[in-house]
Amino acid sequence: ADIDQEAADKSAKEHNVKVQTDDELMANKEIDLILNLTPPSSHKDIIVKSLMSEKHCFSEKPLAMNFEEALEIEKLSKEKGLKVGCAPDTFLGAAGQKSRELLENNSIGKIVLGTFNLMSHGMEDWHPNPDFFFKPGAGPVLDVGVYYITQLVNLLGPIKLINSVSSTAQEERTITSQPRYGEKIKVETPTTFIGSLEFYNDAKIQFFCSWDVWKHKHTTIELYGLEGSMIVPDPNFFSGNILMSKKNEDWQTISNDKMLLGIPNKDDNGSMFANYRGIGLADMI
């Protein structure tokens, strides 16, 4: 099913599967869980429809367009006694779990400071239909930054305080990917965020989240403890080498590609990597 029935019909024909309208899907008693992969502006509506139809729901991120909507979903979920889950689930991968194990074993001591950096020039250079990335409910934080924040919560616990400023560098963007090369996109959400996260364990993390950067040399996540430093691999993926240094020693490479949810299983132009998208849904049920 799809909120765009034409798209649902086309996909069903391509893959030779049954197609249903949204209402038919929600009324189907044989289905007890909905996977919600709609654009961000539709997430809350589909989740609420699922819950009202007595079905669990696992959604693409973000959970909702704002905090108030997320609280409404939480309240309804509890009232119905049903589960709601949300991406990203990459923190369940080998890289996230190994990083957490190292921190729990006090490998670099108490975490005092850190950084995370997500910077590129946006989505219009490669995505065939990039419009929704620049609408409310998307942008660099809600689309990709959530991978970094989720990983940090996995590693450091809950966040106590957030400080941030934002900006929009361009009012319009030009698509340079096919098939819509040359079309203009109206930018309706900030494309740069700079700020800090303060965790309940007193760790302070500085962050840059931007789609206004052509090139940079920053790493993804760095954590600085009283006994050493750690570089956590890209949280958009399930595995990757961890770099760790004890005090003033050289960097040590810690691999996790032999661990559960770290074994390479997907080919990308001849290069294998670990891709276990959907593990969050499996874990929820």
Language-model regions: role of each:
Residues 71-89, 108-116:
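Rossmann-fold dehydrogenase core element
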Residues 17, 53-55, 80-82, 200-204:
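A short helix->loop->beta-strand "cap" motif at the edges of active sites that frequently abuts
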Residues 21, 59, 65, 84-86, ...:
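Hydrophobic residues in well-ordered beta-strands that form the structural core
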Residues 171, 175-188, 194, 199, ...:
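C-terminal glycine/acidic-rich active-site capping loop/insertion
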Residues 8-9, 149:
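Short alpha-helix immediately C-terminal to the canonical SAM-binding loop
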Residues 3, 10, 15-76, 276-279:
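Beta-loop-alpha module in the N-terminal Rossmann-like domain of NAD(P)-dependent dehydrogenases
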Residues 90-186:
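Predominantly a Rossmann-like dinucleotide-binding segment in NAD(P)-dependent oxidoreductases
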